[in-house]
Amino acid sequence: MKTAYHFLIVVLITACITSCATKDEPIVITPEHFHNAIDKVTEVIIHDIFSPPVASRIYAYPNIAAYEILAVNDTEFNSLAGQLAGLKSIPTPSKETSINFELAALVAHMEMSKRLIFSEQEIETYRDSLYTTWKERNEDVFVQSRDYGLEVAGHIAQWMDGDNYKQTRTMPKFSVYADEPSRWQPTPPAYMDGIEPHWNKIRPFTLTSSNQFKPVPPPPFSLEEDSDFYKELKEVYDISKQITKDGDTSEEIAIAQFWDCNPYVSVTRGHLMFATKKITPGGHWIGITKIASKKAGFDVINTLHAYAKTSIAMNDAFISCWDEKYRSNLIRPETLINNHIDDSWKPILQTPPFPEYVSGHSVVSGAASETLTSIFGDDFSFDDDTEIAYGLPVRSFTSFKAAAEEAAVSRMYGGIHYRAAVAVGLDQGQKLGKFVVSALEMKNETMVATN
């Protein structure tokens, strides 16, 4: 009996020591936690087949929520309240709390991500695995941090609900008028309706209006062989024929495929049609942001600064781009080439389901390259492995601007854009990106990462 009593005492003491150790362990949040959380968002965006404009919104709000929590608690950074349209200061926690603000930021990020996608269970499963670990390490800190993160997410979600996204879900579909030869027409193989024709009604973060960076109009539509428009049309056809002839040795085809980023690619087999899974253009640049942040050795707050600034610029870039797309309503090369030059011709890339002018890749890449350059510098070289998961090799770049230029011209190599849409779109995006950089005061002093 005495031996059993002593054994019980030892067990209780051991359990107490173990419990105390577990409950008081620090919860360490690293940049990798945020990289992984954003990778999970990208995975769900691909799974749920969100359009490029909608995907840009999905990236932006979680990054803003996470950034805000850390910015208001770091003297080096500034809150975005009052800088982004309609955003008010996030709730202030009690001074008596034991909040881990990096943990709270990650909670807010995951909560906002969950609210923005269809497959909520994917985020919930990922989140719950982290919650279990954190609770075992320090339940008190975890609970307080979680509750604050959820409170901030609720604040950001309320602000988000005023951006007109919900209203655009019930607006009419884009109307196609086949009797106007210059207007966009649905393209094979899926002949989908035009995607997000009302995206210019979404509230921008920094722009005064969706047409603030309205580009010059495209060349006047004409099928006269000596017209500027026809020359650009013929250029698309001639380039495609040449690089197709070169085949696997064509650098242009490699570039086109690397920057395809079309979540709407459809494959037809017999009477069946199914979609392949691809990253969006914004998702590709979010991947580049991750690569650069890791190479620069950024801590959590600097990592979130890079993600937030870049996703804000891309969100506004898509609004600006889509404003022009459905104003000019320009027909795609594929339609005209099939009707007037070569009825058997197919572009190297599948034509995405929205009007041609301007190139979305060009605008968004231009904007993202400007924000990343403002953070990491003009000559920040990097190896872009973003597309490895989708069966494509690594491509190396000497700067973000060089990557943006390649992303832009890839659309002409792919046979889905005319030269004007590429050149004008890149310029539009660069101007917009520079505006975002100048408009946002996110850091109290300029600190450019070294390569």
How would you describe each model-predicted region?
Residues 3-10:
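Sec-dependent signal peptide recognition
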Residues 11-14, 449:
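N-terminal non-cleavable signal-anchor helices
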Residues 15-19:
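C-terminal motif of bacterial Sec signal peptides marking the signal peptidase cleavage site
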Residues 21-451:
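Acidic/polar surface patches and capping/hinge elements
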